[in-house]
């Protein structure tokens, strides 16, 4: 079977922040229906790359293509629905979970919000939970459910389990695999190499703003600790 064409492809991308080069000549491909791990030391440029993928930051050079189309030709709002970013510390708006899920949507149906919660392994009762009373694991899953209400093709997760206990982290790992099984391209930033080996098929290693290796997890992260 021929390899699947990437849903997201980066070519020659360089970025500058505060007069410092944070990404240099980055090239990578993210296939659909796959969990890809983005690894590397702190300060390697991982979060900067995620921000460039959704045009929160504009690169100095290079391009990002979504399903073959340059993202610079897409409306930013449409891009961020198709490529959803969940930050490491997702912000919850005042009010209940329903208000958070519905934010930015045009008259969402209750069934759509419940469906997103259920994919994130949360029941319909969560719609009425105060957002400021969620546990860390619940907050992470609600943030992912909020992204799913936009029906994205690509989900970017910035260290989604960094501050969670083992049980909550396992729930997020199971969710990542479930989403990839439903056809989403999942790109997750993580420092947990054991997690990489559990959930990812492919890995990309960034160091000093450059891609040092990419490919199957065994080849990229197999010998790292």
Which residue stretches match the model-derived regions?
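Helix-to-loop junction immediately C-terminal to a conserved catalytic motif
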Residues: 54
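ABC ATPase NBD coupling module
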Residues: 70-84, 181
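Conserved ABC ATPase "signature" region
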Residues: 110-126
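Conserved ABC ATPase signature
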Residues: 130-134, 138
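Catalytic Walker B motif of ABC-type/P-loop ATPase nucleotide-binding domains
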Residues: 155-158
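Helix N-cap at the start of a conserved alpha-helix in ABC-type nucleotide-binding domains
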Residues: 166-168
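H-loop/switch region of ABC-family ATPase nucleotide-binding domains
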Residues: 190-191
């Amino acid at each position: 079977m021929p390899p699947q064409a990437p849903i997201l492809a980066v070519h020659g991308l360089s970025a500058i922040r505060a007069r410092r080069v944070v990404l240099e000549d980055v090239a990578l491909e993210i296939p659909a229906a796959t969990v890809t791990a983005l690894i590397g030391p702190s300060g390697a440029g991982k979060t900067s790359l995620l921000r460039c993928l959704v045009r929160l930051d504009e690169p100095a050079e290079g391009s990002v293509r979504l399903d073959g189309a340059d993202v610079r030709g897409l409306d930013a709002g449409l891009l961020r629905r198709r490529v959803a970013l969940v930050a490491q510390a997702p912000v919850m708006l005042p009010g209940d979970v329903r208000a958070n899920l519905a934010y930015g949507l045009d008259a969402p149906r209750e069934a759509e919000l419940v469906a997103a919660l259920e994919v994130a392994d949360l029941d319909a009762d969560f719609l009425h939970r105060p957002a400021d009373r969620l546990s860390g694991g619940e907050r992470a899953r609600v943030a992912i459910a909020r992204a799913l209400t936009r029906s994205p093709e690509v989900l970017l997760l910035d260290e989604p389990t960094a501050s969670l206990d083992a049980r909550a982290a396992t729930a997020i790992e199971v969710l990542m695999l479930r989403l990839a099984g439903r056809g989403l391209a999942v790109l997750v930033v993580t420092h947990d190499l054991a997690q990489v080996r559990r959930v990812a098929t492919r890995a990309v290693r960034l160091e000093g703003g450059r891609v040092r290796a990419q490919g199957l997890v065994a080849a990229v992260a197999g010998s790292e600790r």
